[in-house]
Amino acid sequence: DGSTSTAEAVSMAKRITKRNKVVISPTLHPQYAEVINTLISSNEDEIHYEFSENFEVEKLISKIDDSVSCVVVQNPDFFGSCHSLEQLAEYTHSMGALLIVVVNEIISLGMMKSPGEMGADIVACEGQSLGNPLNFGGPYIGLMSTKDKYVRQLPGRIVGETTDMNGEKGFVLTLATREQHIRREKATSNICTNSGLCSLAFTIHLSLLGEMGFKKLSKLNHEAAIKLYNKLKTLDGFEVKNNSFFNEFTVKLPIDASVFVEKMAEKGILAGVPVSRLSN
């Protein structure tokens, strides 16, 4: 559901800036780009996306002008690489556009600098890896965060903390006036799925981990990836493409990737996903 969250973030940016041009990093997950195109695009929209393994800040900047509503960047990206986004954020803001950062693996936030620290205006995340099994592809949990000044443009509703008549702490649904049963065509979102159970599982898991547990989990992921990375580098015909990564990286193989993945599965090993399967 991180893809849906990303599409909603783009829609939100368009409302805020009142612009229709969207620039998407070439290293965004191609299926996320498809969801954006399906949910957001209209005759008035101009979406710039061309899937590639090359993330170059200068090339992205060259596509940004004063007609752009937002720039969408995944970090770590589809190929597993991690990026510094401060320069991109600064230029994006200078053009009056918003920076949307997509975090496909939320556990990475236990080690990496947060999107907000790098200048993101809106953050869209996939939270499946905390408390939610794979479920044959879903449902998962889409997460979204934004700067305080944009909070009223968030889709759906917000759960707010308050006190009852006895002074006891309680929670209420606030800003629900943005939803379609009240605002109809002027609603900020028209998605009606409810991932409450997934959200609850995510919240319980995160609460049990706590701050230190979350950081430890992130570190374990990274260290395991480094161990595999170092092993693969010693094998003939294997070329690791990434200079920096969190818990995933891209490997060029001496044989067809689909064949390799199939052979590994026979040995009980999930070897990853052939890039060509998702890029075509």
Language-model segments: which ranges?
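Conserved C-terminal alpha-helix-loop-beta "cap" of PLP-dependent enzymes
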Residues: 212-280
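Short, conserved phosphate-binding/catalytic loop or strand-edge motifs used
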Residues: 2-5, 279-280
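Short, hydrophobic beta-strand segments
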Residues: 73-74, 204-207, 247-251
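Conserved PLP-enzyme active-site core in the AAT-like
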Residues: 4-170, 251, 258-264
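Active-site C-terminal subdomain of aminotransferase-like
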Residues: 130-243
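Short aromatic/hydrophobic-glycine micro-motifs
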Residues: 45, 97, 120, 211, ...
